[in-house]
UniProtKB/Swiss-Prot annotation:
SUPFAM superfamilies recorded: Family A G protein-coupled receptor-like
Molecular function as annotated in GO: chromatin binding; G protein-coupled estrogen receptor activity; nuclear estrogen receptor activity; steroid binding; steroid hormone binding
Residues recorded with modification N-acetylmethionine: M1
Organism from which the protein derives: Macaca mulatta
Protein name: G-protein coupled estrogen receptor 1
UniProt similarity note: Belongs to the G-protein coupled receptor 1 family.
SS bond list: C130-C207
Glycan-linked positions: N25, N32, N44
Topology Extracellular: residue spans: 1-66, 118-127, 197-217, 282-307
Subcellular location: Nucleus; Cytoplasm, Perinuclear region; Cytoplasm; Cytoplasm, Cytoskeleton
Regions of this protein lying in the Cytoplasmic compartment: 88-96, 149-175, 239-260, 329-375
Assigned keywords, A-Z: Acetylation, Apoptosis, Cell cycle, Cell membrane, Cell projection, Cytoplasm, Cytoplasmic vesicle, Cytoskeleton, Differentiation, Disulfide bond, Endoplasmic reticulum, Endosome, G-protein coupled receptor, Glycoprotein, Golgi apparatus, Immunity, Inflammatory response, Innate immunity, Membrane, Mitochondrion, Neurogenesis, Nucleus, Postsynaptic cell membrane, Receptor, Synapse, Transducer, Transmembrane, Transmembrane helix, Ubl conjugation
């Protein structure tokens, strides 16, 4: 029993039948599992990574995220806010959605730094901090996903029902929709929190992130339903574009639009699927009998996996600026005008304009069905 407790203290799982009884040792009264080399060999022998190996892998992935994805998400979302606000007199309905989406994504990207440095999942051991972080992240997670879903629906309505929806797709209704989305995001977080908090007031280790009902709601309302709506809307958009371009024969324009649609759906699915699969596996597993209440969290048992899926989910907020704005002609033109206004050096203007064209070439095709940055 002493050996098992020491092994668990080092993050090693001991199962019946995985280790044979050691031969009697007359030179040492007990087996010293505190030695790092012996602990690592035991971990490797059972097919698991040692705590040090998990830390190194998590640190490496965190460095990759911080160096490559975080700057794209942080700078990209700030540029979306600054450029669109600078041209507020020319702001369109999709621009309003872009601004609100950028706000939610920017907060998520900033919060991701906390997760990057949370390699040992320390804040999950502090009930107040764990609950606060979970509430803050869920509000912005829901708002980001809800805005992506609503933008997909709005794009389909704009393309397929252009004549009928002209009276309803106004800036006033767009602002109202943004307000309702933020209210829905807050309600989807605070209402379950209030309900479950009343049931767990006597638990010292209660954390909002570990409540099964909340996790089921997060998987359903934060992934399954939005992905189904996004997939349905963009499949209908594809059908509209195929019909429109089939009569005009503009295949390059159609292929560009279809590639952007494919990128939108794939990025959302790839980034959010690991997080929701991780939560679903936890929900489908039964809690081990006799486990301490504070150690029943699935993240305690699999800290490295939890760290990886969190970084993947944050990556969606980093990639959204590239997909929704920088790949769109409207925003690129606004960005070029913004650079020209803020800089007085003609050479610098020409360099920035050439750089934008080199990275994302302009499209010269024309079409009656405009598939702009609002896709």
């Amino acid at each position: 029993m002493e050996v098992t407790s020491q092994a668990r203290g080092m993050g090693l799982e001991m199962y019946p039948g995985t280790m044979q009884p050691a031969a009697p040792n007359t030179t040492s009264p007990e087996l010293n599992l505190s030695h790092p080399l012996l602990g690592a060999s035991l971990a490797n022998g059972t097919g698991e990574l040692s705590e040090h190996q998990q830390y190194v892998i998590g640190l490496f992935l965190s460095c990759l995220y911080t160096i490559f994805l975080f700057p794209i998400g942080f700078v990209g979302n700030i540029l979306i806010l600054v450029v669109n606000i600078s041209f507020r007199e020319k702001m369109t309905i999709p621009d309003l959605y872009f601004i609100n989406l950028a706000v939610a994504d920017l907060i998520l990207v900033a919060d991701s730094l906390i997760e990057v440095f949370n390699l040992h999942e320390q804040y999950y051991d502090i009930a107040v901090l764990c609950t606060f972080m979970s509430l803050f992240l869920q509000v912005n997670m829901y708002s980001s996903v809800f805005f992506l879903t609503w933008m997909s629906f709005d794009r389909y309505i704009a393309l397929a029902r252009a004549m009928r929806c002209s009276l309803f797709r106004t800036k006033h209704h767009a602002r109202l929709s943004c307000g309702l989305i933020w209210m829905a995001s807050v309600s989807a977080t605070l209402v379950p929190f209030t309900a479950v908090h009343l049931q767990h007031t006597d638990e010292a280790c209660f954390c909002f992130a570990d409540v099964r009902e909340v996790q089921w709601l997060e998987v359903t309302l934060g992934f399954i339903v939005p992905f189904a709506i996004i997939g349905l809307c963009y499949s209908l958009i594809v059908r509209v574009l195929v019909r429109a371009h089939r009569h005009r024969g503009l295949r390059p324009r159609r292929q560009k639009a279809l590639r952007m649609i494919l990128a939108v759906v794939l990025v959302f699915f790839v980034c959010w699927l690991p997080e929701n699969v991780f939560i679903s596996v936890h929900l489908l597993q039964r809690t081990q009998p006799g486990a301490a209440p504070c150690k029943q969290s699935f993240r305690h048992a699999h800290p490295l996996t939890g760290h990886i899926v969190n970084l993947a989910a944050f990556s969606n907020s980093c990639l959204n600026p590239l997909i929704y704005s920088f790949l769109g002609e409207t925003f690129r033109e606004k960005l070029r005008l913004y650079i020209e206004q803020k800089t007085n050096l003609p050479a610098l203007n020409r360099f920035c304009h050439a750089a934008l064209k080199a990275v994302i070439p302009d499209s010269t095709e024309q079409s009656d069905v405009r598939f702009s940055s609002a896709v």
